[in-house]
Amino acid sequence: ECDVIIHTAALVSNAMKDSDMWRVNVMATRNFIDAAKEYNVRRFVQISSIVAYGNSAEGELDENHPVHADGGSYVLTKLASEHVVLAAQANHEIEVVIVRPGDAYGPGSRPWIIAPLEAISKRQFILPAKGEGFFRPIYIDDLVRGIAKAACHSDAAGEIFNMSCEGFMTTKDYFTPLYHWLGKKGPISVSTKLALKISAIASKLADLTGTLNEASPATVVQLSTKSWFSIKKAEHMLGWKPEVSFEEGMEISKKWALDQGLLNK
């Protein structure tokens, strides 16, 4: 028997085909809910993303802030998967909880550790908004603790929770340590306008060569955002807040990256 399912599977990409993103992020979520119902699972926890708020919103956003489909396929499919889950709740099919993580980093993080290190090593990494976009890191262990609390707390049913750091840091402050790990100077920061032009060219070249370019215009826009997220609801309802400092989380991540051979480039 299974009492709670935590649905973490998703394609996290700004470059994959729309059809693949829809199949995995949306249709598979519906299929998973159907399977959960068949086996009388009580609660379904959907791991969504802060991208649900869109890229154009500014300032501190709580769970009551409207969502906005103003991004690429990742934004659209994460929003659509939330709709699937909330519809199941509204139809009394299953008890649901939605968690919207911030920029989750740590050992194994492809978008925020592995991919940037690979791009920096190849001298293919630049920051838009002159490195002043907002980054809302959450160390993976803190996120896992929060998800566990959301999965088990009796009052969490039907609720949505932001889980990120308190406040924000600039993208420059986040990515600078990765340059240091590789013994390089950086990051290189340019205007968003220039970054969009460069990323558009890179995406066209990727299309021509049949490769994926995660440094797409959608990623540029994402790294230029000026919003951060209130975590007061998770603090008050779940008794959760981040415990791992950024410095500690990055030190653990550095050791992991070294052990994986990611810094020998």
Q: What are the residue ranges of the model-derived segments?
A:
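Catalytic helix-loop patch of NAD(P)-dependent Rossmann-fold dehydrogenases
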Residues: 23, 55-104, 125
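NAD(P)-dependent short-chain dehydrogenase/reductase
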Residues: 88-135, 140-141, 178
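Glycine/proline-rich active-site loop of Rossmann-fold NAD(P)-dependent oxidoreductases
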Residues: 79, 92-94, 105-115, 141, ...
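Conserved C-terminal active-site "lid" loop/helix of NAD(P)H-dependent oxidoreductases
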Residues: 140, 176, 200-241
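NAD(P)H-binding glycine-rich loop region in Rossmannoid oxidoreductase-like domains
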Residues: 1-27, 35, 53
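Conserved Rossmann-fold NAD(P)-dependent oxidoreductase catalytic core, especially the SDR/UDP-sugar
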Residues: 27, 31-73
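Mid/C-terminal beta-alpha module of Rossmann-like enzyme folds, strongest
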Residues: 149-215, 247, 251-254, 262-265
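Amphipathic terminal alpha-helices
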Residues: 229-237, 241, 245-265
